[in-house]
């Protein structure tokens, strides 16, 4: 097995309002593209441009297994654990699964292969019972696979008119899924019936209704990104209480909707100086609907927000957001040393963020 070096240091390259300890998990030979944490085991998986996947032990921060074949020489764009011992990986439009119970340190053979998607897959996501796997792709479609039967059960298509950027199941629901797209919209589905329950569209250049000219001028001043970047939806995530869906957009905006009504719960404008790449509810919090993590596409800034009901009441007296209100919400922020590809957290490791950036090293950021 390739040796793995661990470097622990105070993150002097980062500007931050908290003490951040950065640990490098060294093993990949090219950029890390994706990360997934296991909900029951203290392990994470990472996929890379080096066309391999590594499994990491969170107790030692060392690589304990690597998957070096099965991807036909393609970068691994997505990884996703089931509840037991199987890891699902995607490259191009293909999904393959691996049994991690194998005693081998280096894995070469996959268990199952799915070729239901027609274009490159952008996200893999499991439902709460780990029966259904969703895979959204560049065609705008999302495929629903029953992994217990190894068959396609539904294709969610003809509703998104551009790339499907994200898919997430509503926790503890029987049949609800939310997808996001570059067509400026998110859709709330009954995925077993391929039925649209709700749709929210964030059209380019749209402004709230019934605002004054001075308010519009203020929005143009405080939301310069909206004038430059269209509000395509880059990611979605659901809170673990099943009540909220968080949405990140290309104009630097974060929106949270109540899922049942699909009405807007809150909106945060223009903290990132670029499009927002991802929003993520931290898994290490029991009530994670009170906090939200975001990072920008090019500004390299990671922000942890207070999105609790108490804070929302405090700052919602005005229709329009501003820097002062944003500062009230910010619990932690840091400027990472590299452009970030994705991040995740683990319910088994408190106050820790795992970051995949343009370097070859997976980063563990421990918030003190």
Swiss-Prot record:
Pfam families: WD40 (PF00400). This is WD repeat-containing protein 53 homolog. WD repeats lie at residues 27-66, 71-108, 116-155, 159-199, 228-267, 271-315. It comes from the Eukaryota. Keywords: Repeat, WD repeat. PANTHER family: WD REPEAT-CONTAINING PROTEIN 53. SUPFAM superfamilies: WD40 repeat-like. Belongs to the WD repeat WDR53 family. The lineage of its organism: Eukaryota, Amoebozoa, Evosea, Eumycetozoa, Dictyostelia. InterPro entries: WD40/YVTN_repeat-like_dom_sf, WD40_repeat_CS, WD40_repeat_dom_sf, WD40_rpt, WDR53. Disulfide bonds: none annotated. Residues 207-231 are annotated as: Disordered.
């Amino acid at each position: 097995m390739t040796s793995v070096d661990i470097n622990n240091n105070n993150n002097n390259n980062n500007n931050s309002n908290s003490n951040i300890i950065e640990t490098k998990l060294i093993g990949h030979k090219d950029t890390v593209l994706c990360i997934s944490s296991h909900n029951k085991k203290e392990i994470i998986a990472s996929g890379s441009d080096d066309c391999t996947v590594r499994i990491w032990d969170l107790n030692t921060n060392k690589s304990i297994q690597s998957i070096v074949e099965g991807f036909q020489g393609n970068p691994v764009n997505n990884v996703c654990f089931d509840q037991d011992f199987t890891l699902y990986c995607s490259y191009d439009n293909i999904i393959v699964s691996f049994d991690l119970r194998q005693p081998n340190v280096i894995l070469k053979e996959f268990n199952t292969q799915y070729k239901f998607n027609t274009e490159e897959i952008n996200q893999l996501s499991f439902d709460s019972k780990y029966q259904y796997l969703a895979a959204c792709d560049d065609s705008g479609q999302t495929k629903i696979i029953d992994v217990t039967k190894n068959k396609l059960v539904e294709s969610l298509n003809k509703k998104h008119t551009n790339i499907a950027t994200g898919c997430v199941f509503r926790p503890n629901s029987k049949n609800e899924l939310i997808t996001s797209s570059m067509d400026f919209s998110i859709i709330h589905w009954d995925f077993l019936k391929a039925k649209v329950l709700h749709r929210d569209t964030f059209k380019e250049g749209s402004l709230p209704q019934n605002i004054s000219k001075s308010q519009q001028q203020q929005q143009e001043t405080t939301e310069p990104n909206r004038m430059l970047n269209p509000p395509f939806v880059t990611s979605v995530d659901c809170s673990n209480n099943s009540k909220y869906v968080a949405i990140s957009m290309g104009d630097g905006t974060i929106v949270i909707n109540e899922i049942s009504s699909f009405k807007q719960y809150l909106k945060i404008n223009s903290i990132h100086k670029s499009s927002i790449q991802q929003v993520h509810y931290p898994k290490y919090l029991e009530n994670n609907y009170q906090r939200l993590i975001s990072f920008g596409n090019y500004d390299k800034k990671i922000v942890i927000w207070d999105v609790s009901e108490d804070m929302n009441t405090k700052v919602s007296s005005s229709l329009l957001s501003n820097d002062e209100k944003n500062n009230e919400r910010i619990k932690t922020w840091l400027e990472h040393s590299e452009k970030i590809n994705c991040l995740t957290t683990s319910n088994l490791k408190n106050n820790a963020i795992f970051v995949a950036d343009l370097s070859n090293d997976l980063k563990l950021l421990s918030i003190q």
